[in-house]
Amino acid sequence: TYICYKKKLIITSMKKLFILALSAITMAFTTSGTKSLHDFKAKTLEGADFNFADLKGKKVLIVNTASECGYTPQYKDLEALYEKYKTKNFVVIGFPCNDFGGQEPGTSKDIKAFCTKNYGVTFQMMEKVSIATSPIYKWLTKKSENGVLDATVKWNFNKFLVDEKGNLVKYLPSNTKPMDAEITNWIEGK
């Protein structure tokens, strides 16, 4: 009887171990390895902490910006887009970047003054980043991170559209104008 008791104990332990292993395997296959935009934090141009979780429920256009680029006049249309749709749960987030042609050499103070004086920018501008090392841009550009697409940011003013749940929807190149129907239709849900 002692041997029977030991066998039952071993079998019970093995069943528990099997159930735990099966649960772990199930979780591994059902849990997505991708994050959402809402998992990130960054610094604003003014140096304040910014939690992207605060954007839950809003559509977001993220753009890498530069003050000395041929596409710099897009600031005007980015601001117009933001002003038109900000009451409809839409925001624009600008990330100054000096990676392409050294076209954003200024300090945070310089960038803020330039954007305000020349384009009246009121949408959220973040601290200057490098595309190659920014965690948010890693998420935006790697399918293994965002679960949607791989993208190569080739120049300034590349745009990424992110839905209300923080999921990446689309990548658009520099020459896509901020008021392009593809963007406005997406904001309007068309």
Regions inferred by a protein language model and the residue ranges of each:
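Sec-dependent N-terminal signal peptides
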Residues: L17-T26
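Positively charged n-region of N-terminal signal peptides that target proteins for export
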Residues: K6-L17
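Thiol-/selenol-based redox modules, centered on thioredoxin-like
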Residues: Y137-K138, K143-K190
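Structural microenvironment flanking redox-active thiols in thiol-disulfide oxidoreductases
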Residues: Y71-S134
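N-terminal "domain-start" segment that seeds a small globular fold
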Residues: T30-A53
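Amphipathic alpha-helical repeat scaffolds
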Residues: N64-E68
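Local sequence-structure signature of Cys/Sec-based thiol-disulfide redox active-site neighborhoods
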Residues: K56-L61
